[in-house]
Amino acid sequence: MKFVLLFGVLLVTLFSYSSAEMLDDFDQADEDELLSLIEKEEARKDCIPKHHECTSNKHGCCRGHLFKYECQCTTVVTQSREETERCFCGTPPHHKAAELVVGFGKKIFG
């Protein structure tokens, strides 16, 4: 009888320890996931929207429907005949074509 009682106490102790470890792992995973979501949300707030200037931050454009917008630059001649580079976030032509094909496919195949 003492052996069964000792074995039962040992089994309950091991079970509670293993379940506590599993809960700690789940809590850590939840915290990591929450921090990841917060970081992504902050990155979205800091990104440059479509058609806005990205001359100083060429890699900071936001995401579009399917692709991330790209910083597209052009050379502008000012009234004083100086050439300056102006950049804006936009969708490149090959991304526009891909979005058109995907949209067309969604309309046909539902």
Curated annotation (Swiss-Prot):
Tissue expression notes: Expressed by the venom gland.
Propeptide positions: 21-44
Highest taxon listed in the record's lineage: Eukaryota
Gene Ontology CC: one annotated term: extracellular region
Keywords, alphabetical: Disulfide bond, Knottin, Secreted, Signal, Toxin
Main location: secreted
Keyword Transcription regulation recorded: no
Signal peptide residue numbers: 1-20
Cell compartments where the protein resides: Secreted
Database matches in Pfam families: Toxin_35 (PF10530)
Disulfide bond entries: C47-C62, C54-C71, C61-C89, C73-C87
InterPro entries per record: Spider_toxin_CSTX_knottin, Spider_toxin_CSTX_Knottin_CS
Molecular function GO labels: toxin activity
Family: Belongs to the neurotoxin 19 (CSTX) family. 03 subfamily.
Comment text on domains: The presence of a 'disulfide through disulfide knot' structurally defines this protein as a knottin.
Protein name: U1-lycotoxin-Ls1cc
